[in-house]
Amino acid sequence: MDGQPITGGVHPTENLNAEHHDFIKAALNETGTHAGRKYKVLRSSQQVVAGMKYTFYIVFEDDESGQEYKITAWSRPWLQDKGEALKLTFDKHEPK
């Protein structure tokens, strides 16, 4: 994927960078209860949607249950309103 344009559907994110981890940490900080916890990214994807939508599936390193969580980050950096420029969600993920 690196260097090639991304179009249309959902594509795996092959190499997580600092910006991706910043999105994850920001989502964890918004929860209040998970701020600062160490996590492991199980898989991630990205999609062009009037900006970029990133989806990360994580587990917490200190959680023996293996519960997965889904974080989404919708980045539209050209918007002036910071609340609209980055939308974050954090949810429990129940694999099907």
From Swiss-Prot:
It holds the Pfam family Cystatin. Salivary gland. Midgut. Residues 22-65 form the Cystatin domain. It comes from the Eukaryota. Glycans are attached at N29. Induction: Up-regulated following apoptosis induction by staurosporine. (Microbial infection) Induced in salivary glands following dengue virus type 2 infection. GO terms for molecular function: cysteine-type endopeptidase inhibitor activity. Keywords: Glycoprotein, Protease inhibitor, Thiol protease inhibitor. Disruption phenotype: (Microbial infection) RNAi-mediated knockdown results in increased titers of dengue virus type 2 in salivary glands but not in carcasses. Negative correlation between cystatin transcription and titers of dengue virus type 2 is observed in infected mosquitoes. Belongs to the cystatin family. Cysteine proteinase inhibitor. Inhibits cathepsin L-like peptidase. Increases cell viability following apoptosis induction by staurosporine. Inhibits human cathepsin S (CTSS), human cathepsin L2 (CTSV), human cathepsin L (CTSL), human cathepsin B (CTSB) and papain. Interacts with cathepsin L-like peptidase; the interaction results in inhibition of cathepsin L-like peptidase activity. This is Cystatin. It comes from Aedes aegypti. The lineage of its organism: Eukaryota, Metazoa, Ecdysozoa, Arthropoda, Hexapoda.
